[in-house]
């Protein structure tokens, strides 16, 4: 079974247990003889995907208890296997969603870590810097690189901590493992979105035929 999670920069695939990533340009050239079950948040690819007979869109099959308007299918899929907890998907944006008794209580969005860098560099060339991923969040910074890093990482940390209260934290996405290290008992699951997709297919076995 081939699953595909299409974003704005990349398309991530899970082929049984084999995980791989294609750029959007590579994805447009991708050919396969078996069915591909996908979710997609890339507006530019919607027409292309409609014309691909082997591609099966899973989005219409998700029944998700939320009053949030415009919740992305990637966020829905990431939350779909979680009954209670906070789901953090840390990619080009960082999304934080709160689930209680399988009900989505709401969520919020931050820039991704790479985009914080771009924001700083647009403010001033002097703020163009790599981040110090080892910066202490328990001591005030004494140089610009650490000050930028502290501002980003401590801000993200405090917002997630405040949202989590005593709930379990589930991290996914490219920066998910890094952010999970700031929290005790956090779970990093690279395949969280794919688990949601697999659950949908299990609930709708006719999709396989």
Swiss-Prot record:
Cofactor requirements of the protein: NH4(+); K(+)
Main localization (coarse): cytoplasm
Annotated coiled-coil segments of the chain: none
Cofactor mode of binding and number, as noted: A monovalent cation. Ammonium or potassium.
Gene3D superfamilies linked: 3.30.420.40
GO molecular function, one term: metal ion binding
GO cellular component, as recorded: cytoplasm
Binding site for substrate: 68, 72-75, 144
EC number assigned by the record: 2.7.1.33
Biological process, per Gene Ontology: coenzyme A biosynthetic process
Subcellular location(s) of the protein: Cytoplasm
Residues the entry annotates as binding K(+): 89
Active site: residue positions: 74 (proton acceptor)
Reaction it catalyzes: (R)-pantothenate + ATP = (R)-4'-phosphopantothenate + ADP + H(+)
Sites where the protein binds ATP: 5-12, 92
Keyword line: ATP-binding, Coenzyme A biosynthesis, Cytoplasm, Kinase, Metal-binding, Nucleotide-binding, Potassium, Transferase
Subunit structure as annotated in this protein's UniProt entry: Homodimer.
Function text: Catalyzes the phosphorylation of pantothenate (Pan), the first step in CoA biosynthesis.
UniProt cross-references to HAMAP family, sorted A to Z: Pantothen_kinase_3 (MF_01274)
Family as reported in the entry's similarity comment: Belongs to the type III pantothenate kinase family.
Official protein name in the record: Type III pantothenate kinase
Species lineage: Bacteria, Pseudomonadati, Campylobacterota, Epsilonproteobacteria, Campylobacterales
């Amino acid at each position: 079974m081939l699953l595909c999670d299409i974003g704005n920069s990349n398309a991530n695939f899970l082929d049984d247990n084999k995980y791989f990533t294609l750029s959007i340009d590579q994805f447009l050239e991708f050919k396969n003889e078996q069915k591909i079950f996908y979710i997609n948040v890339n507006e530019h690819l919607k027409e292309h995907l409609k014309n691909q007979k082997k591609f099966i869109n899973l989005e219409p099959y998700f029944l998700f208890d939320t009053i949030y308007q415009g919740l992305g299918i990637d966020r829905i899929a990431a939350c779909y296997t979680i009954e209670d907890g906070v789901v953090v998907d840390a990619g080009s944006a960082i999304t934080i969603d709160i689930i209680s008794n399988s009900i989505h209580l709401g969520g919020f969005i931050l820039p991704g870590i790479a985009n914080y860098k771009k924001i700083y560099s647009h403010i001033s060339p002097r703020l163009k810097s790599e981040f110090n991923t080892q910066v202490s969040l328990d001591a005030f910074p004494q140089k610009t690189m650490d000050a930028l890093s502290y501002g980003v990482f401590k801000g993200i940390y405090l917002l997630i901590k405040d949202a989590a209260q005593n709930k379990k934290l589930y991290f996914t996405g490219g920066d998910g493992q890094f952010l999970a290290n700031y929290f005790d008992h956090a779970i990093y699951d690279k395949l969280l979105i794919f688990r949601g997709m697999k659950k949908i297919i299990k609930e709708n076995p006719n999709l396989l035929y």
